[in-house]
């Protein structure tokens, strides 16, 4: 189902997830179109990039797809993909694009390693953007989502809310909202394919008009 109230998004935000494959890129595509924002994935591992997919399904112009800071070939955790290529992912090397509206997508979940000392949550904290968490709707999501929220709060990250992706599960959404003390912004279903023709309408359906 969609969201009963329009969501007020900040001009720049970070999209993370409870796991890999939970729908971060899908949500990022909706936001990039709906908010007329630039998309940036600082660390990409895997030959097929999320930016390429996002361009195909949204039709975003090239100037709104910011180049990755680290583009790694192997579809592995960033620290391992970088190790195999002899690359060191360095904290402090990530400069936010100079644009008014920005959607930043993380790799994997918040505890994914970037190098021998740093995790994805270190990058989230360094960039200091409000965070939107994408979670699955299925069994196991309550635990994964609450742990993710806990880690973000321990680092004093500002949490916008949670987007739940998958078959409708009102009980899990209620539990996430209650125990996580967080707003579930929307329930979405990425089984609905995105295209340049429908992405804006799906953003309106799930999130309403942005103030």
Identify the residue ranges that each predicted region occupies:
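N-terminal phosphate/diphosphate-binding loop that engages ATP/GTP or pyrophosphate donors
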Residues: 9-12, 26-88, 93-96, 100
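Short internal beta-strands
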Residues: 40-43, 132-135, 160-166
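Conserved glycine(s) of the Walker
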Residues: 22-23
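Inter-motif core of Ras-like GTPase G domains
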Residues: 115-138
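C-terminal lobe/tail of nucleotide-utilizing enzymes
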Residues: 7-10, 149-211
């Amino acid at each position: 189902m969609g969201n009963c109230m329009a969501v007020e998004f900040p001009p720049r935000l970070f999209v993370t997830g409870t796991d890999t494959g939970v729908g971060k890129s899908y949500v990022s595509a909706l936001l990039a179109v709906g908010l007329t924002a630039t998309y940036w994935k600082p660390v990409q591992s895997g030959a097929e990039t999320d930016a390429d997919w996002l361009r195909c399904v949204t039709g975003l112009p090239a100037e709104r797809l910011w180049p990755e800071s680290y583009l790694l070939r192997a579809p592995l955790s960033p620290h391992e993909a970088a190790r195999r290529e002899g690359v060191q992912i360095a904290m402090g090397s990530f400069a936010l694009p100079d644009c008014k509206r920005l959607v930043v997508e993380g790799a994997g979940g918040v505890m994914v390693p970037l190098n021998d000392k740093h995790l994805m949550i270190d990058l989230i904290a360094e960039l200091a953007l409000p965070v939107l968490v994408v979670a699955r709707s299925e069994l196991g999501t309550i635990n994964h989502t609450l742990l993710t929220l806990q880690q973000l709060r321990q680092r004093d990250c500002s949490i916008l809310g949670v987007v739940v992706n998958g078959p409708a599960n009102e009980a899990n959404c209620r539990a996430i909202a209650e125990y996580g003390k967080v707003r579930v912004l929307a329930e979405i279903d990425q089984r609905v394919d995105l295209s340049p023709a429908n992405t804006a309408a799906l953003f309106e359906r799930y999130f309403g008009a942005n103030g």
